[in-house]
Amino acid sequence: MGKSTAGVILAKVLGYEFVDADLVIQKEEGKLLKEIIEEVGTDGFIAVENRVNSSLEVDHSIIATGGSVVYGKEAMEHLKSIGTVVYLQLPFEELNRRLSDIKGRGVVLKDGQTLKDLYEERVPLYEKYADITVNESVSYTHLTLPTTSRV
């Protein structure tokens, strides 16, 4: 289950709003993620993503961010200050399978960087910022959502 699916389900269970940060970025910039990346490059996109995520002001919401949000220290500190950061941990093989259309998905890759390189670069950052880590290689939906709804 991906971040958006998990986020929508959790939001419904908790009676919260669901916010897709990628959609917020697209709305604020008036462009698709891949268009932003094409225009300003990966570093420029990360700056935009950091700015937008640092300014999110929501209550009783589940926020699904893009994977590159972990490069923005200000965004991650802001997200941690307004809620609990959950890392949906996936083995590389599963991530590779899910991201078959990597360019169309707006994945931030530097020139010459492979998906494996990106994975190995980001995992320590996800682990650093996570308050909770959920291993997504096993489906826990039936176990975790009822427990979470009591929080």
Identify the function of each model-found stretch.
Residues 4:
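Walker A/P-loop
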Residues 13-21:
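Post-Walker A helix-loop "phosphate-sensing" segment adjacent to the P-loop in P-loop NTPases
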Residues 141-147:
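Conserved small/polar residues in nucleotide/adenosyl-binding loops
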Residues 82-123:
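A glycine- and Lys/Arg-enriched "phosphate-lid" helix/loop adjacent to the NTP-binding pocket
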Residues 23-69, 73-77:
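ATP-dependent small-molecule kinase phosphotransfer cores
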